């Protein structure tokens, strides 16, 4: 009988701990979805052309100066400083890709990388000649997914894990955005992928996005403090009950 009571008390205590931690984590964990503040791409063969404001964002690999790169920036000021970044995902909605014919190739499976920019730029002025520099530190890569998108679907997204890059920005590294490019430029066939932008598209379902999930450490510390307090109170209650039993005997 005493064993059953002890197990019941232990389970009750663990349940209270679980509810406490669950509530605090629910309060402390947040996910925000951010849309771009600037976006553009440029074609190497027309080095002074700017494509800011275009409805597409094109990444291309082909020889004889036909590569294309794209730049995109997000304002992450809505994410508090000194929080723990749990995940950050860049998502681009696929529009269309080249297919295998003549000098064209299907880019499915090709690796596109995202690099952190180290210089400021403007979506309405950036081109191949004045493109900002970048670093491969904490870069992210992803294979081009299969299938064709289109204005009416299906919905096909290409994702990159930018957790480390966003953590750097949140820690004070200047946020100039990122560049997206094929990791093997100057291909013998023309491999090209077009994504939708936040310009000239019907609604936010087409927009590129940066999805950030973060944890506020203050909530964690508060949860630990409450659990510690609960433990002390449980201990005092247990000792008092044991003392009462002893006095009764």
Predicted features along the sequence, with ranges:
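A short beta-strand-loop element at or near the start of a globular domain
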Residues: 44-99
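Hydrophobic secretory-pathway targeting helix
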Residues: 1-31
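Alpha-helical transmembrane segments
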Residues: 20-21, 228-242
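Cytoplasmic C-terminal tails of single-pass
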Residues: 243-249
């Amino acid at each position: 009988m005493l064993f059953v009571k002890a197990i019941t008390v232990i389970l009750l205590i663990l349940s209270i701990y679980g509810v406490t931690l669950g509530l605090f984590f629910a309060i402390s964990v947040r996910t925000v979805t951010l849309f771009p503040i600037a976006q553009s791409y440029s074609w190497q063969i027309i080095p002074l052309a700017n494509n800011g404001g275009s409805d597409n964002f094109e990444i291309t690999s082909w020889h004889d100066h036909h590569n294309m790169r794209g730049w995109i920036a997000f304002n992450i000021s809505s994410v508090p400083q000194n929080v723990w970044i749990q995940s950050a995902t860049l998502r681009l909605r696929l529009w269309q890709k080249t297919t295998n014919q003549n000098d064209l190739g299907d880019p499915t499976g090709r690796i596109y990388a995202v690099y952190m920019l180290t210089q400021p730029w403007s979506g309405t002025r950036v081109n191949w000649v004045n493109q900002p520099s970048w670093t491969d530190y904490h870069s992210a890569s992803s294979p081009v997914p299969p299938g064709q998108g289109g204005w009416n679907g299906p919905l096909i997204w290409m994702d990159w894990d930018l957790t480390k890059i966003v953590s750097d920005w949140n820690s004070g590294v200047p946020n100039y955005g990122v560049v997206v490019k094929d990791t093997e430029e100057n291909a013998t066939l023309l491999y090209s992928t077009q994504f939708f932008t936040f310009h000239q598209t019907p609604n936010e379902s087409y927009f590129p996005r940066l999805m950030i999930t973060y944890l506020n450490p203050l909530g964690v510390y508060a949860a630990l403090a409450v659990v510690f307090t609960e433990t002390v109170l449980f201990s005092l209650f247990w000792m008092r009950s044991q003392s009462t039993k002893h006095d009764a005997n």
